[in-house]
Amino acid sequence: MHIFIFNNASRAANYGIGTYVRLLSDGLLGRSGVKVSFVDMFSDVKEYSIADDERGCRHYQVPALFSGMENEPYCRNVFYFLARHIKAEDDERLVFHFNYFQHKPLASLLKGQYFDCRIVFTVHYLGWCFELKGNKTRFRELIAEGYQPKDDKERGLLAGVENEKEFLHLADEVIVLSKDTQQILAEGYGVSSDKMHLVYNGLGDGLCFDKDKNVGNGRIILFVGRLDEIKGLNYLIHAFRHIADKYADIRLVVAGDGDFQLYLSQCRDLQGRVSFLGKVSSSEVEDVYRSAYIGVMPSFHEQCSYTAIEMMRHKIPLIGTDTTGLAEMLDATPELRVSIDEDNMMDEEFTERLVSCLNLLLSDEDAYQRAADAVGKLYEARYKVSDMVHATCGVMESSWDRPDYTVSPDYLKHIDSRMIQLINQCPDIDTDFYGMGGIGVYLWKRVLDLCDRKEGDFQASLILEHLIYYMDWVQDVVGSSPLPVELWAMIRSMGQHGFYKTCVNALLVRQSGSDTLFQMPSDRVIINVVLNVFR
């Protein structure tokens, strides 16, 4: 199995996604029969290049374009670069592992080029979570049937959801990092449950903590993360201010980069009690965690935070919110889970809840120790890197176990829409099976399949309506020229089912060899053809 991992040399690559890619690839390299290569998008190189790293992994390096980092032309150029160099052996199983929604055009092209490959997508984020600060109630309102967006912001958000949905439907396997995301994708994105796999992020393979933590220099309350509004640091600063006089030995340490000025101004009355470390290097981060007494993540959105896992691994009691994926990371310590009221968020009430959790851990040593032990046990049960690698590799390997598999059933409606769009456009394309013929053969085969399932009635009716336009298009273009055998087989099948008799019968009469029988191509051949029509 040859796994191509797609990554970005971007800000996110220096945070959670970059950590995930590094740990996953390190683990996969130790597995028998697995080869790992990287496609490094937006790389700091001047031209397309190929290089091997010290581990023997091949890197396909793609330079940045100032005109747009990941727009469709950029992805198409990357595809042509990869198609020249990736040559699949007859028995080699190819996995293209994506981590960014912006790469959807590239994934679609690769699926058409390497039909037997598997597209695996790991969901590290959902765009609307940043815009709506993880508010699932508001998200459900926006995607409700019949909802009309009120402004450009809402229209842009919904367009982003549709883009994410198409990629998730295209993917053969979808890896989610939390149960919460699994539910959102099932209910809000229509992703089939049989291709979704819950695999928690993993870090290390054992606890890493001091049994006798030295708090002689004071008890440190630690925040680690980007200095973005969605991380909720301002609430933590307000909460710290409430308790600073009560506990003279506590300090707040903030590790991460971003807009320092905004938060420094909030700490003017806390001089000497709050420290901003900036972005901490990998060589220093261990000391930061070892010195921490309590961790706080007042975030409005997380998937499966490596910061939270690192705190668990060091047996640091963690105070967090009940938002998205963070809630289940606090399963072992529900008393430290701070509720976010999505319908009526009150800043003061939220701050008071943070204060209550901080007071519990700072004033009750037994409660503190119970929480420390609980998070350590949860880490060992759920968040070890060996478990993550084993489960992810299992998802990829088992993807070939489905008999007669061609493409994700979720994706068929998107193919339908693309074929219908081509019918409406009537482009100047060849009439053979790899052009006009493939469009009709695919849609007619879809109708036959949908008619066998009651839930497919609406979609079948939509396709049949456009097949009428399609047959008129064929009649205009083909004239008396011989029909491709695949198109001929489709028209014969239409005649047998009594579809659009006037046009179909006219074509049957006009075509020579009407007594010759041809078989419709197999599903595998048809899907392969229409995926390439997408190009």
Describe each region flagged by the PLM:
Residues 279, 287-292:
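Short alpha-helical donor nucleotide-sugar binding micro-motif in glycosyltransferases
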Residues 317-320, 327:
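Short hydrophobic beta-strand element within catalytic cores of glycosyltransferases
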Residues 175, 214-231, 237-240, 253:
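Conserved donor-binding/catalytic core segment of Leloir-type glycosyltransferases
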Residues 180, 202:
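Carbohydrate-associated surface elements
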Residues 264-283:
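Nucleotide-activated donor-binding/catalytic signature segment of Leloir-type glycosyltransferases, i.e.
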Residues 300:
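Aromatic "clamp/platform" in nucleotide-sugar-dependent glycosyltransferases that forms part
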Residues 127, 142-174:
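Membrane-proximal helix-turn-helix segments that form the acceptor-binding/catalytic region
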